[in-house]
UniProtKB/Swiss-Prot annotation:
Primary location recorded for the protein, binned into one broad class: membrane
PANTHER family: GLYCOSYLTRANSFERASE WBBK-RELATED
Gene that encodes it: cpoA
Annotated protein name in UniProt: Alpha-galactosylglucosyldiacylglycerol synthase
Record-level GO cellular component terms: plasma membrane
Single GO MF descriptor: hexosyltransferase activity
EC number: 2.4.1.-
Origin species: Streptococcus pneumoniae (strain ATCC BAA-255 / R6)
Length: 374
């Protein structure tokens, strides 16, 4: 047998010797890539960034352990450092000389999207805008969860080739329909009959989410039960905090505000929904839509340009509160027509499944790590 020279233990691959007839096939097994995640998103409950972050990390730990070593918030060398939030210490770390590999920034929001979400003093708005774009410019590549962000980033001076769109996704083992007998029990627990029509919404309680329209619909349709899951993730900084806090403490009798709930309770609320309604005026890439779709809840949304791109008609589009009201009454009178929306929800779930997105992320990290080695 031919003898091979000894290889140093520091070599970045193994030689696997396979024999096929008289030929020797040498297959080089690449080393695992080290991806270091930097995120403070889970310090704030009840907002989508933390959910998207945890879904990605969980998926990579479970399904990519043969290709990646994933760490979180460690001061270590890595092939790729993935910044999920724009904390100031993270910003400062981009100036350090230690090898952090390729710096990837996750764009969950732009300065303009903070309008209607947080109360930012007028004199600070310019500073916040400059900081956000300065952070993004420190990155070697950006990932957007909202394809509509790309043009805004380009307008801010970031090269188009430095931006990649990769959507959010959800775990079907976590977000799934419940058995009918469980739904009946949940309705009984809430004192609701089997034929009581229920509209569920979810998200932070803030103006841009269209919460005012949700409340008005409850007032105008007292025969319908409305449930909005979510609260003030950013406390008093939330735009309209005092106004909405007062309403939540004294809502219409047919409107339930359970507050920020656990994923298990949220899954139950999706199961209760005859219709999931998100009346947002401005959205990033709402995890609640993907969660509701994975639970096979029929979905109705305000007719935003973003949804036309990412959801491709797999929902009921409405121009405003009056159309929402007409649609709710239509579905209440004829629940059978909701079957079509249920099928469309399944289409959304298939498009944004873990299986579909896993390979996209693996290919992306591989490409970025290779660029970082050049």
């Amino acid at each position: 047998m031919r003898k091979f020279p000894l290889f140093s233990s520091s070599l970045s691959f193994l030689l696997l010797i396979l024999f096929k007839e008289n030929d020797i096939i040498v297959v080089m097994e690449k080393k695992k890539l080290r991806i270091n995640m930097l995120s403070s998103s889970e310090k704030v409950a009840g907002q989508g960034v933390s959910g998207a972050y945890r879904e990605l990390v969980r998926l990579l730990h479970r399904a990519a352990k043969d290709q990646l070593i994933v760490t979180e918030n460690l001061p270590i060398e890595a092939d790729v450092t993935h910044f999920h939030t724009i904390d100031f210490p993270y910003y400062l770390s981009t100036f350090q000389k230690k090898r952090s590999g390729r710096k990837i920034g996750y764009v969950h929001f732009l300065p303009a999207t903070l309008e209607g979400s947080l109360k930012i003093p007028f004199f600070l708005k310019g500073i916040v805008k400059r900081y956000v774009f300065s952070f993004y410019n420190r990155m070697e590549h950006l990932v957007v969860v909202n394809p509509m962000f790309i043009e805004d980033l380009v307008a801010a001076g970031i090269p188009r080739e430095k931006v990649t769109y990769i959507p959010n996704f959800v775990n079907k083992e976590k977000w799934h329909p419940l058995p009918q007998e469980e739904v009946v029990r949940l309705r009984t627990d809430l004192g609701l009959s089997d034929n009581q029509f229920i509209v569920v919404g979810a998200g932070q309680v803030q103006k841009r989410k269209g919460i005012d329209d949700f409340i008005r619909l409850a007032e105008e349709l007292p025969q319908i039960t409305f449930i909005w899951a979510g609260g003030f993730s950013f406390g008093g900084m939330t735009d309209g905090y005092e106004h909405y806090k007062t309403i939540m403490e004294n809502p219409p009798k047919n409107l339930i505000f359970p507050g920020i709930v656990s994923p298990e309770r949220m899954r139950e609320l999706y199961a209760l929904a005859d219709l999931f309604l998100l009346p947002s005026y401005n959205e990033l890439f709402p995890m609640t839509i993907l969660e509701a779709a994975s639970c096979e809840a029929p979905i109705m949304l305000r007719d935003l340009d973003l949804y036309k791109v990412i959801l491709e008609g797999n929902y009921r589009a409405t121009a405003g509160r009056e159309e929402m009201k007409e649609a709710i009454l239509e579905y209440q009178a004829n629940p059978a027509v909701l079957k079509d929306l249920k099928e469309k929800a399944k289409n959304i779930s298939r498009e944004y499944s873990e299986e579909h997105l896993l390979q996209i992320w693996l290919d992306f990290y591989e490409k970025q790590a290779a660029l970082g080695r050049k």
